[in-house]
């Protein structure tokens, strides 16, 4: 992540724009004939951000519903990734875990749309500007969380554990951690620090799910080349963080006692019955989802 981004961002600036583009993709997915996921808050949140180009993306539908996004098949990828993380949280609940932490929550609306079981508490960590925006927007939409939602305003590149504890996080309880669309925007050293902190805060039986990119430079280059009309997300994506590989992430977790597993993105496309990748969509083979459980 570029040094000039160390001061933070909101959904309309910096890397926050990429979270807004992801929400726009979820809005498009929801209008498909048989949507893989339904996020009724995606379009209202994007519209509230107020970036015209992203609002237009969110309001697309039909055969042209993927035009203008960062890379080909991005809507399919966001659909598959979103469903994967939805399934991850639902499975953890079934196994009795009631404490969840969403790292880099952005415009994630899971606390409002997943079928949380009684006693579920969800901590949403993100930059102060992002947290303030989502709190105000969801209040304006009169949206009601389906779990005990506890937003935490903190920078994940700094000391975020104390603010999390202040909000009531209990390290003695098993936790479901998620880092969806986060790690590629952190520098390698910041990634490792986040993984170390997660491990220090986790008890036996805790789980983690995260997506990684093995060649962040190629991703940034492909995004720049694939853009159509001028889009503000292009400039924020140029500051992708030079992140660690999925292998490095898995190794770090294993060093802390986690049992990890990796799945390349094409496996998710197949698992959710999506069309196979074309030759010019090989970039997705460098995107991996890492899951882990603390033994």
UniProtKB/Swiss-Prot annotation:
Keyword entries, A-Z: Methyltransferase, S-adenosyl-L-methionine, Transferase
Enzyme class: transferase
Amino acids binding S-adenosyl-L-methionine: 126, 155-156
GO BP term, example: methylation
Family annotation (Gene3D superfamilies): Vaccinia Virus protein VP39
Record flagged with keyword ATP-binding: no
Pfam families: LCM
EC code: 2.1.1.-
GO terms of molecular function: methyltransferase activity
Role according to the record: Exhibits S-adenosyl-L-methionine-dependent methyltransferase activity.
Record-linked PANTHER family: S-ADENOSYL-L-METHIONINE-DEPENDENT METHYLTRANSFERASE YKTD-RELATED, S-ADENOSYL-L-METHIONINE-DEPENDENT METHYLTRANSFERASES SUPERFAMILY PROTEIN
Similarity comment: family membership: Belongs to the UPF0677 family.
NCBIfam families: mthyl_TIGR00027 (TIGR00027)
Protein name, UniProt field: Putative S-adenosyl-L-methionine-dependent methyltransferase Mvan_0910
Phylogenetic classification of the source organism: Bacteria, Bacillati, Actinomycetota, Actinomycetes, Mycobacteriales
